[in-house]
C-alpha cells in the first residue's frame, strides 16, 4: 500500500510539472505481470519518439524496477492519478485515471477470437469503459463490430484501423536476422485454459516425439506466457531435457525462435498469422476437434477461412510428419500467398505513423 501511495504522489507531481510545460500526458499501463515484458520493447519504440507536445509515463504491476519512466502502481490506484490526457493499454483494464481518454490497442494481427463465447459478453461490457479500440485491419473491425452487436450493445468504443505495431517493429529492427537459415520447427500454443476445445496441450508430448523421430529439424516449444509455469510445460521439459534438438523458449521476444523456424505448429493462437507475415513461412494448425469451429460460429472468421493460404490443418498426430513434407514442397507457393494476404492490412508497415496521426486527432 505504501509503495502505491508513493507512486501516486510522485506521478501527480510529475504530471503537474509536465502540465506547467504545456505537455499532453500519455500514460501507458501494463495490467498483467506475465505479459508486461513481451509488449514492452515495441511499445517503448512506439511512444519514445512522440512529438515534443507529449510526455510519456508507464505504469505496471511487476515487482522489479523496470526503468526510469516506469512506475509500479496497482490498477486500483489509477483512479488517484490526475490530469492524464491519454490512457493506453493493450490488455483490458477496469480502473482508469479520471477524465482521461482511454485507448485499447489490440495485440493480435488477425480476426481470431479474443475469448471463448461464454466470456465474450462480459469482455464487451468491460470494453465500454474505453473511448477507442485500435485494430490492425478492416477484418478485425468487422469482427469486433459484430461482437458488440451480438449482445445488443449499440454504443461501443470508436473502432480505428491502424495496422499492426509489433510486426512493423520486428520487420524494421530484425530484417537481417529473419533471413538466417531455417533449421527448426516451432510449436506455439494459445493459452491452455483459454479455449479448452481447441488446445493442443494434451497432444504436445506426442507431437514433439513425432517431430524428433521423423524429421531432422530442431524442435522449439514456445508456450503462451501465462503458461510458462504450468505443470504440463515443466513435465515436457523434464521428458525431453536430454535431447539436444529440443528446447523450450521462455524469452519475451519470439523473434529468435521464429527467425530460425521453417514451420510453426499451433492450435488456434493468433501468433499463426504473426509468424507467417513475419517470416513468410507456413503454419500447420493442429485441430483434432475441427467441428468446434462451426459449433462456436467461428467458421466465417478469416482466421479459419484463410488457413490454407498460409499452411494446412492436421487432425491426427500420426499424420504430422507426412503433412510437414507436403508443406515443405510448397514453400515458395506459401511465401507468395502470405505476401498477398499481408496486403489486406492497409497500414502494413505504416502502423506507427498511423497511430500517431490518430492520437493527434484526439482532443
Model-inferred region functions:
Residues 347-363:
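C-terminal alpha-helical cap of glycosyltransferases
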Residues 23-171:
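Active-site and donor-binding regions of nucleotide-sugar-utilizing enzymes
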Residues 73-82, 227-273:
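Donor nucleotide-activated moiety binding/catalytic core segment of transferases
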Residues 92-106, 113, 250-296:
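A donor-sugar binding/catalytic signature common to diverse glycosyltransferases
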Residues 1-33, 38:
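Membrane-proximal basic amphipathic "stem/tether" segments
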Residues 55-70, 212-249:
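Catalytic donor nucleotide-activated moiety binding site of glycosyltransferases and closely related
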Residues 36-46, 165-236, 312-314, 346-347, ...:
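Conserved catalytic-core segment of nucleotide-activated headgroup transferases in glycan assembly
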Residues 155-156, 270-343:
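Catalytic binding pocket for nucleotide-activated donors in carbohydrate/polymer assembly enzymes
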